C-alpha cells in the first residue's frame, strides 16, 4: 500500500528513509523537497500529486513525515498511520525534533520494521510495541520461551493493545470528556450554524486484564442509523443526546454498543482516546454575545458588546477572551469595561477583552469609542464577526457519564477498589457572532 516513508527536517534533508516498493525511486525524495518543502507558496493540501506519485504528508514542529505511493490507496488509512507513527515516536523519545530523530534513528527503523510490513500497517499500539522494543531500541537476548509466547499472543491475538502481567499498587481510572463547541450567530441572535466535536480520553492504571463498562446518557440517538430523531431528544431533555457520528478505539466491543448503548472494553494501559463524536442537536451554548455598532459620521464608531453566560450559577467559566474587530483606518480607541481588562491591539486590528472567571447566569459589557482616519475608500467596512474563547466545566453537547464500572475476576478486585475520576471540559472552537 505505502511505497515509501521519508522523514525530513525543515531544510528538506532526509533524516529517515525506508522504501517498501520498487516503483519508488530516489527522485521521489527530491520531488517532495522541491515541490512541497521549498515551494514558493505554502502548500495547504495534505496530499500532493507529482508525476503520478502521491505524497501524503503531515508536519510536526519543523519535521515533515511523508508517505509515498503510486497506487490508489485509502487516504484516511495512510493519515491514520502517519499520526499514529507520530504518537509512537512521542511515546518513545518525547518531542519530535531533528535532534531526537538523529539520536534515535536506530529505534525508529526498528519501529518501522514492526509497524509496516511491505507497506501495510500491522501493529501501531505503543503498549504492544514496548513489550519487544525497549526504550533504547535494543531487543533483549534473554527472553524465555514464556515471555516470547506472551509477545506473540499479544501481537497476533485479540488483545494486542494490552500486555499481560500489569500490576499497580493502587488501581486508578481517569476519564475526561473534552468538547469543542463551534458557533456562528447572526446579530439578531439567530443560530446560523452550531456543532460540538467531542473526545472521551481515558488514563487507566489498572492491574491485570480488567473489563470496563462505561455508560452515558439514558438515551443515545445515532442520527445516521435512523434509530431516532431530534424530536425524541428534545422531549427527554438532556437525559438523551443525539450523536451525528462517532468512532471508537479498537478495544471497544461494538456489538454491545449497538444493542445496549454501553461501551464495554478491555482498556489499554496508560492514556488513550476511547471515543470521538460529533453532534449538532440541542447544544448548550455557554455564552451569548450581543453586539451593537453605531456609526457616528465618517470618523467615529461606537461599539457596545454584552456577553451573557448561559449555564448554572454554581459553575465558573475561565480563560474568557472576546476579540472585537476594528476598521483598518482606526486611529485611536477609548475602552470602558465592567469586568476584566480590555486593550486595543493595533497590530491585530482588534480590541481584546479578557476576563479571568465568570459565573453562570451573569452578564458583562464593554463599550468603546473608535476614532477613524479620513479615507477616500468608498467601500464600507465589512464588519468581521466578533470571536470568543473560553473554557467551561461541563459538556456543551449534554453528554453525561452515568456509570463507570471495572471488573477483574482473576486478581479478585472489584469496582469499589478502583479510584475513579471524571472531568468535563468544554472549550470554544470557532465561536463567532456577526455584528
From Swiss-Prot:
<dbReference type="InterPro" id="IPR018240">
    <property type="entry name" value="Clathrin_mu_CS"/>
</dbReference>
<dbReference type="GO" id="GO:0006886">
    <property type="term" value="P:intracellular protein transport"/>
</dbReference>
<feature type="binding site">
    <location>
        <position position="345"/>
    </location>
    <ligand>
        <name>a 1,2-diacyl-sn-glycero-3-phospho-(1D-myo-inositol-3,4,5-trisphosphate)</name>
    </ligand>
</feature>
<keyword id="KW-0254">Endocytosis</keyword>
<dbReference type="InterPro" id="IPR022775">
    <property type="entry name" value="AP_mu_sigma_su"/>
</dbReference>
<dbReference type="Pfam" id="PF01217">
    <property type="entry name" value="Clat_adaptor_s"/>
</dbReference>
<keyword id="KW-0168">Coated pit</keyword>
<dbReference type="InterPro" id="IPR001392">
    <property type="entry name" value="Clathrin_mu"/>
</dbReference>
<dbReference type="GO" id="GO:0072583">
    <property type="term" value="P:clathrin-dependent endocytosis"/>
</dbReference>
<comment type="similarity">
    <text>Belongs to the adaptor complexes medium subunit family.</text>
</comment>
<comment type="function">
    <text>Component of the adaptor complexes which link clathrin to receptors in coated vesicles. Clathrin-associated protein complexes are believed to interact with the cytoplasmic tails of membrane proteins, leading to their selection and concentration. AP50 is a subunit of the plasma membrane adaptor. The complex binds polyphosphoinositide-containing lipids.</text>
</comment>
<keyword id="KW-1003">Cell membrane</keyword>
<dbReference type="InterPro" id="IPR043532">
    <property type="entry name" value="AP2_Mu_N"/>
</dbReference>
<dbReference type="GO" id="GO:0008289">
    <property type="term" value="F:lipid binding"/>
</dbReference>
<dbReference type="InterPro" id="IPR043512">
    <property type="entry name" value="Mu2_C"/>
</dbReference>
<dbReference type="InterPro" id="IPR028565">
    <property type="entry name" value="MHD"/>
</dbReference>
<dbReference type="GO" id="GO:0035615">
    <property type="term" value="F:clathrin adaptor activity"/>
</dbReference>
<feature type="binding site">
    <location>
        <position position="354"/>
    </location>
    <ligand>
        <name>a 1,2-diacyl-sn-glycero-3-phospho-(1D-myo-inositol-3,4,5-trisphosphate)</name>
    </ligand>
</feature>
<dbReference type="Pfam" id="PF00928">
    <property type="entry name" value="Adap_comp_sub"/>
</dbReference>
<keyword id="KW-0653">Protein transport</keyword>
<protein>
    <recommendedName>
        <fullName>AP-2 complex subunit mu</fullName>
    </recommendedName>
</protein>
<dbReference type="InterPro" id="IPR011012">
    <property type="entry name" value="Longin-like_dom_sf"/>
</dbReference>
<feature type="binding site">
    <location>
        <position position="341"/>
    </location>
    <ligand>
        <name>a 1,2-diacyl-sn-glycero-3-phospho-(1D-myo-inositol-3,4,5-trisphosphate)</name>
    </ligand>
</feature>
<feature type="domain" description="MHD">
    <location>
        <begin position="170"/>
        <end position="434"/>
    </location>
</feature>
<keyword id="KW-0472">Membrane</keyword>
<dbReference type="GO" id="GO:0031410">
    <property type="term" value="C:cytoplasmic vesicle"/>
</dbReference>
<dbReference type="GO" id="GO:0030122">
    <property type="term" value="C:AP-2 adaptor complex"/>
</dbReference>
<comment type="subunit">
    <text>Adaptor protein complex 2 (AP-2) is a heterotetramer composed of two large adaptins (alpha-type subunit and beta-type subunit), a medium adaptin (mu-type subunit) and a small adaptin (sigma-type subunit).</text>
</comment>
<keyword id="KW-0813">Transport</keyword>
<dbReference type="InterPro" id="IPR050431">
    <property type="entry name" value="Adaptor_comp_med_subunit"/>
</dbReference>
<dbReference type="InterPro" id="IPR036168">
    <property type="entry name" value="AP2_Mu_C_sf"/>
</dbReference>
<keyword id="KW-0446">Lipid-binding</keyword>
Amino acid at each position: 500500500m505505502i511505497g515509501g516513508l521519508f522523514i525530513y527536517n525543515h531544510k528538506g534533508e532526509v533524516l529517515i528513509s525506508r522504501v517498501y516498493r520498487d516503483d519508488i525511486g530516489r527522485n521521489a525524495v527530491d520531488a517532495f523537497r522541491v515541490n512541497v518543502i521549498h515551494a514558493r507558496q505554502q502548500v495547504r493540501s495534505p496530499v500532493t500529486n507529482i508525476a503520478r506519485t502521491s505524497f501524503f504528508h503531515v508536519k510536526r514542529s519543523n519535521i515533515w513525515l511523508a508517505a509515498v505511493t503510486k497506487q490508489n490507496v485509502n487516504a484516511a488509512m495512510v493519515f491514520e498511520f502517519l499520526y499514529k507513527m507520530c504518537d509512537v515516536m512521542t511515546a518513545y523519545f518525547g518531542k519530535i525534533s531533528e535532534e531526537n530523530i538523529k539520536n534515535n534513528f536506530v529505534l525508529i527503523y526498528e519501529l518501522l520494521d514492526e509497524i509496516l510490513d511491505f507497506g501495510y500497517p500491522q501493529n501501531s499500539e505503543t503498549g504492544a510495541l514496548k513489550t519487544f522494543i525497549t526504550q533504547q531500541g535494543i531487543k533483549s537476548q534473554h527472553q524465555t520461551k514464556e515471555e516470547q509466547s506472551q509477545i506473540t499472543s499479544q501481537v497476533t491475538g485479540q488483545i494486542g493493545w494490552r500486555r499481560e502481567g500489569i500490576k499497580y499498587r493502587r488501581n486508578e481510572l481517569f476519564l475526561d470528556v473534552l468538547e469543542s463547541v463551534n458557533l456562528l450567530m447572526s446579530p439578531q441572535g439567530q443560530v446560523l450554524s452550531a456543532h460540538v466535536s467531542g473526545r472521551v480520553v481515558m488514563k487507566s492504571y489498572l492491574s491485570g486484564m480488567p473489563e470496563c463498562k462505561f455508560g452515558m446518557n439514558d438515551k443515545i440517538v445515532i442520527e445516521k442509523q435512523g434509530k431516532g430523531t431530534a424530536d425524541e431528544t428534545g422531549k427527554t431533555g438532556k437525559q438523551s443526546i443525539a450523536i451525528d457520528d462517532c468512532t471508537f478505539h479498537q478495544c471497544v466491543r461494538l456489538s454491545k454498543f449497538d444493542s445496549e448503548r454501553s461501551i464495554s472494553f478491555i482498556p489499554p494501559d496508560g492514556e488513550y482516546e476511547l471515543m470521538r463524536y460529533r453532534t449538532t442537536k440541542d447544544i448548550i451554548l455557554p455564552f451569548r454575545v450581543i453586539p451593537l455598532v453605531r456609526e457616528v459620521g465618517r470618523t467615529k464608531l461606537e461599539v457596545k458588546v454584552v456577553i451573557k453566560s448561559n449555564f448554572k450559577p454554581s459553575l465558573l467559566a475561565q480563560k474568557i477572551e472576546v476579540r472585537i474587530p476594528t476598521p483598518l483606518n482606526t486611529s485611536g480607541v477609548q475602552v470602558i469595561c465592567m469586568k476584566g481588562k480590555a486593550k486595543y491591539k493595533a497590530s491585530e486590528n482588534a480590541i481584546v477583552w479578557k476576563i479571568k472567571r465568570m459565573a453562570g447566569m451573569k452578564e458583562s459589557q464593554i463599550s468603546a469609542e473608535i476614532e477613524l482616519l479620513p479615507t477616500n475608500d468608498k467601500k464600507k467596512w465589512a464588519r468581521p464577526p466578533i470571536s470568543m474563547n473560553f473554557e467551561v466545566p461541563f459538556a456543551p453537547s449534554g453528554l453525561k457519564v452515568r456509570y463507570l464500572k471495572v471488573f477483574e475476576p482473576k486478581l479478585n478486585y472489584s469496582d469499589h477498589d478502583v479510584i475513579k475520576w471524571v472531568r468535563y471540559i468544554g472549550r470554544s472552537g470557532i465561536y463567532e457572532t456577526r455584528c
